[in-house]
């Protein structure tokens, strides 16, 4: 219900017309805003941390893999090197976005995590075709799964 008019003797005063906190007309929250259960908050934080951790592990694995590839090697080695560098950079940037406290809005976080998920899946496919890169491909898939879980939490 909308707020009622202030008492006749107090009309025109700010104190009579502005109510905040739990005395506000809508229970302390702006219209359309609901409270989040403690369980939902814990799940959000756990999934966010798990995603950031998986991004860190993937970035490390991809940077290592890129460093092991001969820069003057065959064309497929150059692709592995480029994908490794790109995936490491995207995962590192995603970890930084997830680690910042309220520095990015939800749309920015969602876009960054989705981009990371896509790059990880593409990189895993490239690493699958490169002997010795199986662990790196698995790190990429684990990161993509963590990104998917976090995106599910945001929905």
Which residue stretches match the model-derived regions?
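Compositionally biased, low-complexity flexible segments
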Residues: 2-20
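Amphipathic alpha-helical hairpins
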Residues: 18-155
